[in-house]
Amino acid sequence: MKNLFLIIGAPGSGKTTDASLIAQHDEKFAHFSTGDLLRAEVASGSELGKLIDGFISKGNLVPLDVVVNAIVSAIKSSNKSNIIIDGYPRSVEQMTELDKVLSEQDEISLKGVIEVDVSEDVARARVLGRARGADDNNEVFNNRMKVYLDPIKPIRKFYSEKELLHVVNGERGIDEIVADIKNLLAKLI
């Protein structure tokens, strides 16, 4: 049985860094982003990978059901028993599809959804302060924040009703945040 943990949060919340640090320092955990999972599936040469490559190579979005199947495939083929995926789900549709697929199999159990909570001001300061790419500007940040905020209430409600949602204060030092998430993961396994 694989234990699945989802880490969600606003752009700049630190969710990817948090998940990466946990996986680097605890060999029981693997960390994936959705993009990593899709690229790994393509690299595997599987039929699913060929299907994904057909969309990506033409610059098209990969259909939702294909993305979720890639996530499930990567989780099942991982040599780790605890999987952290950050930044997923990003929409009610993604959440619903993942829930449907997970309910149809018995090899993966969703153990928790961790929201790294930061204010919009903190998120903005972090994203604009890091300026990792050309897309790290105020206009793009506002759009990314809207994409995050629009579905977050129904996503929180859905996972709260399943008693899976755990909120961590992301406005502290990285060591404190990671320690809190590690403690939470240990309780949920």
UniProtKB/Swiss-Prot annotation:
InterPro entries: Adenylat/UMP-CMP_kin (IPR000850), Adenylat_kinase_CS (IPR033690), P-loop_NTPase (IPR027417)
Short name of one Pfam family: ADK
SUPFAM superfamilies on file: P-loop containing nucleoside triphosphate hydrolases (SSF52540)
Segments of this protein annotated with the region NMP: 33-62
Catalytic activity: AMP + ATP = 2 ADP
Region described as LID: spans on this chain: 129-135
One BP term from GO: AMP salvage
Pathway this chain belongs to: Purine metabolism; AMP biosynthesis via salvage pathway; AMP from ADP: step 1/1
Keyword entries, A-Z: ATP-binding, Cytoplasm, Kinase, Nucleotide biosynthesis, Nucleotide-binding, Transferase
Main subcellular localisation: cytoplasm
Single Gene Ontology MF annotation: ATP binding
Record note on domains: Consists of three domains, a large central CORE domain and two small peripheral domains, NMPbind and LID, which undergo movements during catalysis. The LID domain closes over the site of phosphoryl transfer upon ATP binding. Assembling and dissambling the active center during each catalytic cycle provides an effective means to prevent ATP hydrolysis.
NCBIfam families tied to this protein: PRK00279.2-2 (NF001384)
Subunit structure: Monomer.
Annotated protein name in UniProt: Adenylate kinase
Organism: Campylobacter concisus (strain 13826)
Gene name of the encoded protein: adk
